[in-house]
């Protein structure tokens, strides 16, 4: 931000109001005509001033939402306007650091010396200025790089119920991706999980090229909402430097819940399942800031916590329409020890055709067809009622379950390059094609394939590769 913009953000005269009442976490102030989004401080009689933000108006009063608890606030306290807009200090020195929603270090180290500034809430790149996405981003996870290939600048959702392993999956991406910079936003996390994620899921190597923005569940809703904007602003800064950035947010659901608190406190009417309109207005504003620009790219993965395993609950349903694809984590697969528990048939990457070769896409289609054929007949197979030879495709699907699951399962510390993921996928396709040809020939001759049993195995296929359990 240039010096002119900085000067314009500072009010030329002091604007002062007084506290009239509090309601929940909001403070109503009289004689304080500050704009929405402006920053103010409440002068308490004891303790330092309390920072707050203008979130709306009610009758003749201005409604503020504080960044900390309201302890010490009383009727008549003076409220002073401090700034009408916000910016962040940024720079390469943020790499390897853990910061809060205000950009301050919380990792016990000295504050980084940052010389650059960026706007806290930037406008997304103009649609006509966005280049097409044509290059793939390697996540290091075979199930994604092989069957759900993502492009640099794509926005994906990771949908799962609690305890299925989405945090572990995001940590694997941060460790194994080929992105230049990783920005991780932990919104509404339990306090104990922050260090666990940094030390166990991310590791020293992942942290060295990452910026971690943290707002735990005990912090006010405004802080949790700002954490998402702070992380996105930092990702935008590195994108402007020509970097390919990977933004990981856990989770977009908690961001929506925090905005619901703010919206209801500001007097918005509750709509679908108690969510006010501002939630559904704010999510696309946040998501559209990511993507590709003429300088670089921000590839974003947003974790979405699915309430009661219902994929059609309001937040999940709205987010699917905003993003360029989704990765669905299955509790059923997780219960079988299949990690990462990615349900390939329920997942989708809309940009995969633009960033993969024809051969790769055909191989992915073949594996999907085999997985679908097995799922359609799984009940018959599990009770031994399926008769081998009745359907050559199902016969091959049964035979290929072990190698396919071996491809999809992956240990946390295991990294698969793009070449390895693609090469293994093509080998699976060739093996499936050979088996299908033999099965079709045997079916035409009225015989079972050589060495095949007459009935499909009754046992459920397990994951042959050991993997870490989710949190």
Task: Give the predicted meaning of each segment.
Residues 1-139:
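Acidic-enriched and Gly/Ser
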Residues 1-3, 24-27, 41, 59-60, ...:
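A broad, low-specificity signal for short, low-complexity segments enriched in glycine/proline
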Residues 77-79, 93, 106-154, 167-172, ...:
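P-loop NTPase nucleotide-binding/switch module
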Residues 146-147, 153-471:
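P-loop NTPase catalytic core
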Residues 2-3, 80, 139-144, 231, ...:
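Phosphate-interacting basic helix/loop segments used at nucleotide- and nucleic-acid interfaces
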């Amino acid at each position: 931000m240039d010096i002119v913009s900085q000067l314009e953000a500072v009010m030329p005269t002091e604007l002062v109001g007084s506290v009239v009442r509090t309601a929940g976490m909001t403070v109503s102030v009289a004689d304080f005509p500050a704009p929405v989004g402006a920053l103010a401080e409440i002068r308490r009689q004891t303790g330092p001033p309390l920072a707050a933000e203008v979130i709306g108006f009610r009758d003749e009063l201005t409604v503020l939402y504080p960044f900390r608890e309201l302890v010490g606030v009383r009727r008549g306290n003076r409220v002073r306007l401090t700034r009408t807009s916000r910016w962040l200090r940024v720079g390469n020195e943020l790499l390897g650091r853990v910061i809060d929603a205000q950009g301050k270090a919380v990792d016990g180290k000295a504050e980084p010396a940052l010389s650059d500034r960026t706007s806290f809430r930037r406008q997304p790149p103009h649609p006509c200025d966005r280049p097409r996405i044509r290059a793939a981003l390697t996540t290091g996870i075979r199930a994604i790089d092989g069957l759900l290939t993502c492009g640099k600048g794509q926005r994906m959702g990771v949908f799962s119920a609690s305890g299925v392993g989405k945090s572990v999956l995001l940590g694997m991406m941060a460790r194994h991706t080929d992105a230049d910079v990783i920005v991780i936003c932990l919104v509404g996390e339990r306090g104990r999980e922050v260090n666990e994620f940094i030390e166990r899921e991310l590791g020293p190597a992942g942290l060295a090229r990452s910026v971690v923005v943290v707002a735990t569940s005990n912090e006010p809703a405004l802080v949790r909402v700002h954490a998402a904007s702070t992380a996105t602003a930092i990702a935008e800064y590195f994108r402007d430097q020509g970097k390919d950035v990977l933004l990981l947010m856990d989770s977009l659901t908690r961001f929506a819940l925090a905005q619901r608190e703010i919206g209801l406190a500001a007097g918005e009417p509750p709509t679908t399942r108690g969510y006010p309109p501002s939630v559904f207005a704010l999510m696309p504003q946040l998501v559209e800031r990511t993507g590709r620009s003429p300088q670089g790219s921000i590839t974003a993965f947003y974790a979405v916590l699915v309430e009661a395993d219902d994929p059609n609950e309001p937040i999940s349903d709205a987010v699917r329409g905003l993003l360029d694809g989704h990765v669905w984590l299955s509790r059923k697969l997780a219960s079988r020890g299949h990690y990462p528990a990615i349900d390939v048939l329920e997942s989708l990457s809309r940009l995969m055709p633009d960033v993969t070769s024809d051969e790769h896409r055909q191989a992915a289609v073949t594996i999907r067809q085999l997985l679908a054929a097995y799922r359609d007949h799984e009940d018959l197979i599990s009770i031994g009622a399926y008769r081998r030879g009745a359907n050559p495709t199902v016969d091959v699907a049964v035979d290929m379950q072990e190698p396919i699951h071996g491809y999809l399962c992956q240990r946390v510390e295991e990294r698969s390059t793009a070449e390895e993921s693609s090469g293994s996928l093509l080998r699976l396709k060739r093996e499936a094609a050979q088996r299908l040809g033999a099965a079709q020939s045997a079916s035409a001759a009225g015989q079972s394939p050589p060495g095949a049993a007459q009935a499909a195995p009754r046992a459920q296929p397990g994951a042959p590769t050991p993997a870490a359990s989710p949190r």
